[in-house]
Amino acid sequence: MNTTNKQLTEELNNTESNNDHNDFAENNIINLKQLKRKLPEELQVQAEELKIENISSLLKQELVFAILKKSVEQGGLIVGEGVLEVLPDGFGFLRSPEVNYLAGPDDIYISPSQIRRFGLRTGDTVEGQIRAPKAGERYFALLKVNRVNFEDPAKAYHRVHFDNLTPLYPDEKLGLELENNSKDSKDFSTRVIELVAPMGKGQRALIVAPPRTGKTVLLQNIAHAITTNNPEVFLIVLLIDERPEEVTDMQRSVRGEVVSSTFDEPASRHVQLAEMVIEKAKRLVEHKKDVVILVDAITRLARAYNTVVPSSGKVLTGGVDANALQRPKRFFGAARNIENGGSLTIIGTALIETGSRMDEVIFEEFKGTGNSEIVLDRKIADKRIYPAIDITRSGTRKEDLLVDKIILNKMWVLRRIIDPMGSSEAIEFLLKKLENTKTNCAFFEMMKSPERPRNGL
């Protein structure tokens, strides 16, 4: 171990000393991540300036590769970043979230010796200086490792494996409440969630949703609340088997990492993307970071696993293979609060009432695995009341660890008041009360003491 640490220190020292050689001007340093974020039109303009031929026939990844190669020929320095995928042969590639972790010509090769030296695993976010392909090579290669998971590379060597970390109930609240300055009922969705099913860091939550009940908008509102109130949280939105226009809408409305696999892609692609996302999240949690993954939808992910898993010969009701749900359950079960720092929160949607027996079986299998549930009601949505949350059927386990005792008592009083009502009347009643206040604290101030619950509001 001492020898390994010595080699690691020498490597880091070499990295620092080598950073000084080739003193390029600022405009000669190309950031690969920023380059990939550019629009195709902007890349074409840059390619024309570099006098690259046949631009119109190149895909975006091929265009990025051509720009990088030409820039290196003209004396440029390239700094790249990506998420490591280690292949069975021992070497790996840095995949880019900008292209949904698809393999492409602009991926960065990492040698087996570098992977061993820094203790890297699939899912590690690696940043460093890269070099152009030599004669006979196809890919750019990592020259120096500057950071691993946004920290010093030496820290990656001493981290504890995710499976060895101790899981606990969530005990730190994930703030979702946003002040309301309009009377648009959609604005109250996160406030309603705070009242009926508060979320904590490390929560494993299911949004149970029939079709057309506003689950996508609800996810967008949750994502916006998380990025606004919890800037320390690393947010990933994972869209599986989704419509392309919904992907674009989510990318433009969410300030976080949005990765997707659309319905026209094979099931193996859905699975590969989900595995990359969960491995990346685990590596960040090992570095004591708080990560939130919003998944739309867990049901479609389970369908994809059912397609790619080798047949066991045992088929359950609805055509679900007996072994198909083990891996999506492992994905969902990775959500946990970690003792001594770090958490992984997963909020996923489960589809019901789709007319598919398979979807019902998948939902029943996942039903008891979460520790928080938000149930959407089709009857409420048909009345165009949003959020279409069924208050009486929604809730969080061990909510007393997340909410102050006085507030918790008032939340229970609220539940006793709305319990005799129907689901539609309950949400209408609550929204009407929330319209008169900007925050939930102000709403609770309107409530009288818990001794008289029937006249509480």
Swiss-Prot record:
Binding-site residues for ATP, renumbered to this chain: G200, K201, G202, Q203, R204, A205, R212, T213, G214, K215, T216, V217, R243
EC numbers: 3.6.4.-
InterPro entries named in the record: AAA+_ATPase, ATPase_F1/V1/A1_a/bsu_nucl-bd, CSD, NA-bd_OB-fold, P-loop_NTPase, Rho-like_N, Rho_factor_ATP-bd, Rho_N_sf
UniProt domain Rho RNA-BD: residue ranges: 77-152
A GO term for molecular function: helicase activity
Pfam families xrefs: ATP-synt_ab (PF00006), Rho_N (PF07498), Rho_RNA_bind (PF07497)
CDD domains according to UniProt: Rho_CSD (cd04459), rho_factor_C (cd01128)
GO biological process terms, semicolon-separated: DNA-templated transcription termination
Superkingdom of source: Bacteria
Residue ranges, annotated region (Disordered): 1-23
Keywords: ATP-binding, Helicase, Hydrolase, Nucleotide-binding, RNA-binding, Transcription, Transcription regulation, Transcription termination
PROSITE patterns noted in UniProt: RHO_RNA_BD
Matching SUPFAM superfamilies: Nucleic acid-binding proteins, P-loop containing nucleoside triphosphate hydrolases, Rho N-terminal domain-like
GO cellular component: cytosol
Record family assignment: Belongs to the Rho family.
General function of this protein: Facilitates transcription termination by a mechanism that involves Rho binding to the nascent RNA, activation of Rho's RNA-dependent ATPase activity, and release of the mRNA from the DNA template.
UniProt-listed HAMAP family: Rho
Oligomer and partners: Homohexamer. The homohexamer assembles into an open ring structure.
Protein name, as recorded: Transcription termination factor Rho
Classification of source organism: Bacteria, Pseudomonadati, Pseudomonadota, Alphaproteobacteria, Rickettsiales
Underlying gene: rho
